[in-house]
Amino acid sequence: MCCMASIDCLPDELLVGILSFILTNEAASTSILSKRWRTLFAFSHNLDCNDSIFCHPRKNKRKSFRYFLYKTLANLEGYSRIKKLSLKFDEKSNIREGHGKLVVNHWICNALEHGVSELHLCFEYMGWY
């Protein structure tokens, strides 16, 4: 039952619109609110991801950014269109390690398959030439 002040009374389309204004990492944290909220962030048309949220002294925290973004892109509904993909990597990022460049390329290709119209990539100094 909905009360007049409850955010749960809002239609999914409006909630997805609201979630599209915050970082995808933060929008994903709303999935703990209820079963209804579990997948709402994945319907957002704007994916704005910043790996500094995941950059932690422990390496496995940094790898969790790769996993989070991989799962987010993989779980997009087939009909979902991405308007904007924004990826920000800071100097502490481990994206240079191992297959990092291939992973970023995969994310970009996946976004292109979903019709991305804006692509923002920010690599703070990483020593790449």
Curated annotation (Swiss-Prot):
Domain F-box: 4-50
PANTHER family the record matches: RNI-LIKE SUPERFAMILY PROTEIN
Protein name: Putative F-box protein At3g42722
Listed InterPro entries: F-box-like_dom_sf (IPR036047), F-box_dom (IPR001810), FBL60-like (IPR055294)
UniProt xrefs under Gene3D superfamilies: 1.20.1280.50
Organism: Arabidopsis thaliana (Mouse-ear cress)
